[in-house]
């Protein structure tokens, strides 16, 4: 789980990104001070160095684009099993209807 210091730096970086401002150590520190959050001094520098040269907006907007392929493969397997499941349901319905004809409801008074 992320610590308070990590989350504070992440949120500060997201605020700067949303305002189209360059993410620098000084600006992250400014936001943290304005929010009244105290973090270890190495966190803002660590985050700004990790985010250098990355296109964060494209990363955020394309988060789910790579995930779509996995469910499609699982769906194909389920589609091949569907006819077998339908046949089983038909057989169960036939058995139930035969039992209903035999019972006729007279077991209610037993």
Curated annotation (Swiss-Prot):
Phosphorylation of Ser-97 converts eL12' to eL12'-P. Gene3D superfamilies: 1.10.10.1410. Keywords: Phosphoprotein, Ribonucleoprotein, Ribosomal protein. The modification Phosphoserine is found at residue 97. The modification Blocked amino end (Ala) is found at residue 2. GO terms for biological process: cytoplasmic translation; translational elongation. Residues 69-110 are annotated as: Disordered. Coiled coil: none annotated. The keyword Transmembrane does not apply. Residues 69-83 have a biased composition (Low complexity). PANTHER family: 60S ACIDIC RIBOSOMAL PROTEIN P1 (PTHR45696), LARGE RIBOSOMAL SUBUNIT PROTEIN P1 (PTHR45696:SF10). Belongs to the eukaryotic ribosomal protein P1/P2 family. Plays an important role in the elongation step of protein synthesis. This is Large ribosomal subunit protein P1. It comes from Artemia salina. The lineage of its organism: Eukaryota, Metazoa, Ecdysozoa, Arthropoda, Crustacea.
């Amino acid at each position: 789980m992320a610590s308070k210091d990590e989350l504070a730096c992440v949120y500060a970086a997201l605020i700067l990104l949303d305002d189209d401002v360059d993410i620098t150590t000084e600006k992250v520190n400014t936001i943290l001070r304005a929010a009244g959050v105290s973090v270890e001094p190495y966190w803002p520098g660590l985050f700004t160095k990790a985010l250098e040269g990355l296109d964060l907006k494209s990363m955020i907007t394309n988060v789910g684009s790579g995930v779509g392929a996995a469910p499609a493969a699982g769906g194909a397997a389920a589609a091949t099993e569907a006819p077998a499941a339908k046949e089983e349901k038909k057989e169960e319905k036939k058995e139930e209807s035969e039992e209903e004809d035999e019972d006729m409801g007279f077991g209610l008074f037993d």
